Curated annotation (Swiss-Prot):
The keyword Glycoprotein applies. The gene is LTPG22. It is found in: Cell membrane. It is a lipid-anchor; GPI-anchor. Expressed in seedlings, preferentially in hypocotyls and roots. Also observed in siliques. Probable lipid transfer protein. It comes from Arabidopsis thaliana (Mouse-ear cress). A lipid is attached at S152 (GPI-anchor amidated serine). This is Non-specific lipid transfer protein GPI-anchored 22. CDD domains: AAI_LTSS. Glycans are attached at N113.
Length: 177
């Protein structure tokens, strides 16, 4: 009761709490939206997780046979792209190796064009997430083996959104006070 009265007597504190809550809900809902349509496809590709999380040297036969059957059906191709795009999101519950996830189709001898991922995910051509797919496509067309895709120095799209939300919250607080 005392806490409620404190918020009631201090509208700036109430505004701050609401702003922070909205910011965190907005950031969390992006992963939920991305993964929402992928539940079936991801459960189909569960056997591929050891490979894309760098726990197995090669995808197993179950992974590859499932990928061959499912890649052109439903959301599987888009979900594989989403897995790469959201690879660093703690909400996934596991760490995805972007190079391994993008090389999964070729490791299973399944035709899939990773360069189509930015279009499938409706990414802006110059966005950091789009650049991951572009770098991988360029490196795999220039060499027989796959080079590592550098992501540590780039600012990810999700980080940009979170930074924008934090700035909006800070400006709101500054304006109220």
């Amino acid at each position: 009761m005392a806490r409620f009265m404190a918020y009631n007597q201090n509208p700036q504190m109430l505004a701050l709490c609401i702003t922070v809550a909205v910011m965190f809900l907005g950031v969390r809902s992006e992963l939920s939206q991305d993964i929402k349509g992928c539940q079936d496809a991801m459960s189909d590709l569960y056997s591929c997780l050891p490979f894309v999380t760098n726990k197995a040297k090669a995808p197993d036969s179950t992974c590859c046979s499932t990928l061959k059957v499912k890649i052109d059906k439903g959301q599987t191709r888009k979900c594989l792209c989403t897995l790469v795009k959201d690879r660093d999101d703690p909400g996934l519950g596991f760490k995805v190796d972007a190079n391994r996830a993008m090389s999964l189709p070729s490791a299973c001898h399944v035709p899939a064009n990773i360069s189509q991922c930015p279009d499938l995910l409706h990414l802006l051509p110059d966005s950091p997430a789009s650049q991951i797919f572009k770098q991988f496509t360029e490196s795999s067309s220039q060499t027989v083996g796959h080079k590592a895709v550098s992501t540590s120095s780039s600012i990810k799209g999700r980080d940009n959104k979170q930074f924008g939300l934090m700035m909006a919250g800070a400006l709101s607080i500054w304006y109220i006070m």
